[in-house]
Each structure stands twice: as C-alpha cells, then as structure tokens.
C-alpha cells in the first residue's frame, strides 16, 4: 500500500520544521492545508463569512502563505464558517466574497491555489456554504481564476447525493476531492456509497487532482487500508492521498 502525499486540517497546531522533517523521512508531499479556522475548540469552523473578523482573516491568509511556501504546499482550503445570527444574509455574503477576493489574490501572488469546501449542515448546523451550488455562486461572484471547489463526496451525499452528476456539472471548478462513506464517515466500503463505480467514473472523466481520505477509520488506520488496493494507480500514474479527518 503506497500513499504519496498528505493533507492536514489545522496548520496552527503544527510546527513547520517537524512536518517538513516527517514529509522528507517518509518521502511524502503536502498537497493541502486549511486556512486558520478561528476558535475551533469553541465551535468555530472558519471566519471568512464573519463580519468584523476581516483583519483576523487577512492575518490568517498571510500565515497560510508562509506555511504553504515553507512546505511547498500548492493549495489551501478555506472553511468559511457558521453564518452569524446577528448579521443579515447580505452582510454575511458580502463579507465572504470580499475575503475570498483578498485571499485568492494574495495566494495567487504566492503561486498557491485557494479552495472552498461545502460542508453539510446536518452535522454542522449553520455552516454557510452547505451546498455545492451555493459555493459555485460565490465563486462566480468573487470572479477569480485562483478560486476552486474542494468537493467532499461524504458532505455531498449528506446534502442530496447525485455524486457523479454533481461532479460532472461542476468538474471545471473542482480542484480537490475528499472521500468517506455514509453513514458513519468511515472508510470507503463501509456504507452506502459505491466508490468502485465513482473512482472508475473519475478516471473516465480524466480527473487529475488528488483524492483525500478524510474519514474516521473504523479500526486502526493500517488495518482498514485494504479498500484502496484496487483503486490505487500503478507506478507512473497519479496515486490517491491519505488525509486527516475533520
């Protein structure tokens, strides 16, 4: 079993030197990390849509650029946050659009791609971008050529399914895919999602990005990697990645 890359969720809890050393020792590359997401332990899941937190967001972008540059990470994901009840919908949207324009421009200057991720609002009530269609409307309004979707198949399944149809509809906007099965958010093969069908379809669609394994292993990590054996490409072709769960 061979994984060639990693993704990590919270950069602020990691020391760059330690991560760089671990990547080198294990012959891995880092392909994605998240922007700072506010007070995670306090329930925040991003600050990009929070009016009044713009300075914090911009500082986080600078921090993410330093972090990604040092670790040669080509893309950064933005969790946009929970819509604050005290703000109007228009205010929340304007704040998010302005912040994403800022981040996309700054990251582009550093040669780093910006992603946003729709997250299901069943498990995280109030998450502002809970559907792919809404996220794409934000991308359109931002109008940047450096802003893409992170398409999490588990979140899409929770919010309505149509996994392949949704991919095909928005594939030009999708730069990164994540997997987990439903119910339980465990490894592929433990639930209702037909990943053999989906992986074959993604190959037919010539998907070129990474696929992050953002799931909760149902047993020890190494004990449940068998699902990937038939899906990993042979040497010389793209391989899937293993990532941390949110």
Regions found by a protein language model. Give the residues of each.
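Structural motif corresponding to the early beta-alpha repeats
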Residues: 4, 8-94, 208, 217, ...
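Active-site acidic/histidine proton-transfer and metal-coordination neighborhood
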Residues: 45-148, 158, 238
